[in-house]
């Protein structure tokens, strides 16, 4: 670089200040100095900028946002960030990515040239400070997609407004308002029509607000479920960040099962294969490498291998971005239970429509035959009655009939499901479970079998090497120095090169940081801290030729390396001890000698493995061989280097959770890749197996044994199996299929890519949030955020709570429907009028549908729910217990209201208006008291745990206050009159009798045979086969 001293400004500046120059000369000298300085600076820039973006420059010059300065102490990295404009055309790079233009990449200097232009150091990543990340986000955009705007409140108002019954009521309100004003004047004539308007408006607003709120809730949960974690390299450290925080220039680590978070280029890795079917539709897996195909695209998934990727496009600049931006995720997913309730709503609505039609016909006939009176006079006197009066009366009759339909249709049922699901999903998040599919909430309550993994679910997944055997000799921590240097060097190779983990050693020389899977971290920690491995040195001395990543089918991983010092090629295998042992013909001793693996030696080593496994240790073996060629990983004739035992303790509370599931009638089956001895030890520790079990031999099988059964044997033995060891994902899938064929509702936990088929096949797929791959999560219904089996038990409890809450509301609402329909129908037939006006019925509909749903759908789960047996696939949605409760309460309400209708005036010595108000008030208060009964369908104490549900208490209080306002202050609006204290006391007393009636009702025994099966053709929706609701599409 040109020396700055070459540009000497001192003489120039001195000449500018000399007194001999006149004013004009000084101005010319200043102009010359300015031009000269600019030329000098441009010359410097031309030399400095290429030096900074040259891909062949040193690490210091590649340090993107930092300036390398020379000082007396040598080159140092300045900590001050440097604003820069990328030395690359971003739009051109996006087009190159979209077209997979390899010559275009090469023209930019290859992947390394692109990295240099983006100021990325491939070995250190970008700088992780907020200023640097924000600058890159401003320059290249954020890793988010522009979604179509969510549905607003007006959309839901419009949806509610489109309801046919609402439209008919509005038409009736318009006619009623017009004729009322014409007949009685605007001061008195607007009340009836205006009241219907206000009531309809309230129904629309409340319905729209409820749906809008739930839409927002589901959108929020959807954003959370899309916020996956990505591992990146920043400031030389591997760290996990949100996918939304990935920026251009980031170095991203990819492994099997990961979803690629942005468009990028392959930096380094091995055996990388990508599934691009989500983007191209092609099912074939594509191999990605540095030379021929370095292109990696957002949204695609890694199916094999591992790699590091340089991010070059994010968000809307990615190939997938434009496609995703046009997709609006539908949060209005209909669950199977909602579909069943829609059918139930439709059927009850038809019954209500029939009753309303009969009421309409009867009232019209009675009116036009002169059998109705108003203020003691006949309403219709043929041609003497004004047309306006006739039309107004007909409109009033039609409005009453339509309102009966409104009350009869249990529109609150789907709302109750939505409220319950939204409430449960929100609460389950705090209980470490994220729901991805709504149907899983209700289905989980019916689970009869849970197939669970061991590692990380039943155990802590915090591995630590506690045993090490070299050949037939146990090596303790204090005796590792006795290991031969040659064997030690091979162990360094076997752990340091055959791994997907990494070791980060800071400049300060503090304790190294280990990253990777728990197993990899444990092995690296043991090799570095106990055996003294320098991982960076090991990597520099060897060249990795080929890698075979860990496979759950083979249960091992391998690497082919060339030692640079002597150019020899070595094969290293690592994996399940008995699998690796089967590949060995010799073994190393601590002195470095190699002994023959005869039958006696193999038996002794197998006994060592079984002994460690019986102590709940996970056994990993290392084997080595000098290879004859550099293209194939040989799998036989290896030499066993050593066996380590990793301790992974059970999670606290797992045994209690297992016991809870057993009491709930749910069978736990542990499916693991560990050997049978380790699996049994953990199963006993967790309580899955009991030492008193007589059928212990049938309870434990190996995967190969299970898959080799005949179909008949599998179906016969599958119920008895509690533990399946050395299993593959295909064995897990096979077990799930067998269990479902036997009628079980199956929940399955999984974390690997290969678990995806089993997760999809199961009725409920539960993926692990920490160790789970993105492929597994996408295949699942619920993500267990803490990977803890205790959270699985909590999900089971929530599932039962959802189903139970919906049944409570069905019982409550059908009671109101039956009572309202019968009382209006009988009164219309016999007296020619309906005791409850359109506005009053709309008010009942409002408190019943919305407030009732809120009160009953938000009950929290109790431990009592887990003392019941699971709900069967074919069990009726409306049980005999529910029929008993709702029929008794309905009959009581009908009896009370009919007595008030026909004898109320004489019993209480009141006029008709007071009697009608008593009927309306008593009917509403009956629903308030019956809400308490609905809290418990079988238990006699309906007040237990009431203090924990403040929302229920609040809604009851609000309902009572609003009812008082309706009766006492909105007389014109609600067509009521004021009641005195004695009359209020009578209404409360009559309504409160529903409590003792509900208490004694629960002593009435019920048959186990479904109630409607006694009829010749029971409606299928009530009997309700649950198979469609549980079977995956």
From Swiss-Prot:
Family: Belongs to the cation transport ATPase (P-type) (TC 3.A.3) family. Type IIB subfamily.
Location relative to the cell: Membrane
Domain remarks: The N-terminus contains an autoinhibitory calmodulin-binding domain, which binds calmodulin in a calcium-dependent fashion.
Protein purpose: This magnesium-dependent enzyme catalyzes the hydrolysis of ATP coupled with the translocation of calcium from the cytosol out of the cell or into organelles.
Gene Ontology molecular function: ATP binding; ATP hydrolysis activity; calmodulin binding; metal ion binding; P-type calcium transporter activity
Binding sites annotated in the UniProt record for Mg(2+): 751, 755
SUPFAM superfamilies: Calcium ATPase, transduction domain A, Calcium ATPase, transmembrane domain M, HAD-like, Metal cation-transporting ATPase, ATP-binding domain N
Record carries keyword Transmembrane: yes
Protein name per Swiss-Prot or TrEMBL: Calcium-transporting ATPase 12, plasma membrane-type
EC number(s) given by UniProt: 7.2.2.10
Positions on the Cytoplasmic side per record topology: 1-152, 213-341, 416-806, 858-877, 931-948, 1003-1006
Residue segments, region Interaction with calmodulin: 25-36
Membrane topology: Multi-pass membrane protein
Pfam family, one: Cation_ATPase_N
Active-site residues, record numbering mapped to chain: 453
Lumenal face of the membrane: 174-191, 362-397, 826-836, 901-909, 971-980
